[in-house]
Amino acid sequence: MAGRPRIKDVAEYAGVSPKTVSNVINNFEHVSDRTREAVKEAIDALGYRVNLAGRQLRQGRTGMITLAVPELDVAYFAELAGLVMAEADRRGRTVLLHRTNGVRERELAALHGFDAQFTDGVILSPLALHPRDLATRDRDLPVVLLGERPAEGGTDHVAIDNVAAAREATAHLLSRGRRRIAVVGGRVRGRQGTDRLRTDGYREALKEAGVPFDGDLVIPVDAFQWRDGARAATALLDTDPRPDALLCLNDHLALGALRALHERRVSVPGSLDVVGFDDIEASRFSVPSLTTVAPDKQEIARAAVALLLDRIDDPGGAPPRDHVVGHELIVRESTGC
């Protein structure tokens, strides 16, 4: 074949229309697996290469999406980032990672900053945004929020039911006879962030069981890191009476707490139960292994990418959607499994 192969050449080789070849190149899902494979074989056989610059110029798109998360040294976000990148790659997109440190200015930069000019849309896990930040954002840039949402409505959103998840975890502890259950990382006032929602679920479970709520057992932390869990557990061991269970609002806190309890020779689960959130890989390998709430991270990634690409393809389409992802309480050794 003389010259560089074109879409027309690929179509003739595969026995399909040029439109079908274009659909395969753009990873449209309605193409059958058999046809998709035939087109890919033709592309490989002819050495066809997509003219990315030309396609982006025609579409006004970059083929890139941004994932903005608070931290990458927190295992939950690192694992989620890997899943989002894999899902985006499957859909023919490249992911630009943006670490915000949970700082409002950096979260705003993901939506309005220099980098936002080079991305087709943003998946953002916010910690510090104000409701007005979303109300005044550039509507030309599609956005999907993960986890916390500063304001109701107006933006596509993917999350687990944090209230139900914490209620289930607390009910598990109550079923084991625990009554003085401390919430490490909890919060009873302020906006409806993840920590507040999980504390609400904890309180609901106590109420359903007829156990009085004790505000002294809600322990705020500076950060959701291992050391903060260890500090909180150490402080709780010096109270009288001690708690008989810890509901830690992420696995980093729980694993830090386990270390502090081990150093103080407190038997887990003999004297005290520990439950975490997120089901990070380390939770399966701690001693004792950690009972934890496992959000469906694979589904979070799939739904977030799908919602964002739908919004990129049809900005004025469906109204903003809330996608609630399932969760599972994984019972392990830290609560007697």
Give the positions of each predicted feature.
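Flexible loop/turn connectors
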Residues: 234, 239-245, 249-337
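N-terminal helix-turn-helix DNA-binding module of bacterial transcription factors
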Residues: 1-63
